[in-house]
UniProtKB/Swiss-Prot annotation:
Family: Belongs to the universal ribosomal protein uS2 family.
Listed name of the protein: Small ribosomal subunit protein uS2
Disordered: annotated segments: 265-292
Organism, scientific name: Cryptococcus neoformans var. neoformans serotype D (strain JEC21 / ATCC MYA-565) (Filobasidiella neoformans)
Function: Required for the assembly and/or stability of the 40S ribosomal subunit. Required for the processing of the 20S rRNA-precursor to mature 18S rRNA in a late step of the maturation of 40S ribosomal subunits.
Biased composition (Low complexity): 277-292
Length: 292
């Protein structure tokens, strides 16, 4: 079934195609496996094979319809040994309820029931058949269907549903997992169909993109430095205001002293002056009443 023959509700919108092109999901590699020739649109002058995005969307919807029929979401196992897909599979698992294996796949997880990591999923989804070959081989041993994002140089051996897309770019991997998760939720009826936003799914593709741990640490350090600088500025402002208050009090005290000094005071006695000496030889003045 081609993309133009899909039901109208399942057809790709202009925004979806723009997202696929912006994330370079249509750019393959210079090598092309024989099993992937049907998904190649043309070959550029520099040798890069261009993938037909119409067939990419067709296989994406087919995989979503298969996953939506599984009653227990925990029976789906998503795997990514490629670092660019670690965050994407974890987000897919958190939104859909699937089991996520991010990082190294433990050999025997599907075949050796003695191991603690033993699982019996009904279907698995892998990011790259070349990197996740161990999981695909073990799934083939126990008859577990495999859905894989396949680049032009990937082999489709033991792969039941191959979704042609660029599986080497961080943006391409994150966007493909985002679109697959969104279609599964739409087919389940969890998310209404509509544009991304309040009327539809309010999750953006950026949440599925890979983030460099050093970049995260750098952002955390910048935030901590900004917070420390803000605290220092606040402390300096508080110290400046306190110093201004002390200066104002000191100026007020000096002004009071100046006012008191300007007020008139009583003449003080000069204890250094000698008293005027009297004449002890002079006779006392006669009494006005007369003598005896």
């Amino acid at each position: 079934m081609s993309a133009d023959k899909l039901p109208k509700a399942l057809q790709a919108t202009e925004d979806d195609i723009q997202l696929l092109l912006a994330a370079q999901c249509h750019l393959g590699t210079k090598n092309c496996d024989k099993s992937m020739e049907n998904y190649v649109w043309k070959r550029r002058a520099d040798g890069i094979h261009v993938i037909n995005v119409g067939k990419t969307w067709e296989k994406l919807v087919l995989a979503a319809r298969v996953l939506a029929t599984i009653e227990n979401p925990n029976d789906v196992c998503v795997i990514s040994a490629r670092p660019y897909g670690h965050r994407a599979v974890l987000k897919y698992g958190s939104f859909t309820g699937a089991q996520a294996i991010a990082g190294r796949f433990t050999p025997g997880s599907f075949t050796n029931y003695i191991t603690r990591s033993f699982k019996e999923p009904r279907v698995i989804i892998v990011t790259d058949p070349r990197v996740d070959h161990q999981a695909i081989r073990e799934a083939a041993y126990v008859n577990i269907p495999v859905i894989a994002f396949c680049d032009t140089d990937a082999s489709t051996k033991f792969v039941d549903i191959a979704i042609p897309a660029n599986n080497k770019s961080r943006h391409s991997i994150g966007l493909m997992w985002y679109l697959l998760c969104r279609e599964v939720l739409r087919l389940r009826g969890t998310v209404p169909r509509g544009p991304t936003g309040p009327s539809g799914w309010d999750v953006l593709p950026d949440l599925f993109f890979y983030r460099d741990p050093e970049e995260i640490e750098r952002e955390a350090a910048e935030k901590a430095a900004a917070a420390a600088a803000q605290e220092g500025a606040d402390a300096e402002a508080a110290a400046t205001s306190a110093a201004a208050g002390v200066t104002a009090e000191y100026d007020a005290g000096n002004a009071a002293d100046a006012v008191l000094a300007a007020q008139p005071t009583e003449t003080a006695l000069d204890w250094s002056d000698e008293p005027v000496a009297g004449d002890w030889a002079a006779e006392p003045a006669a009494d006005a009443q007369g003598g005896w």
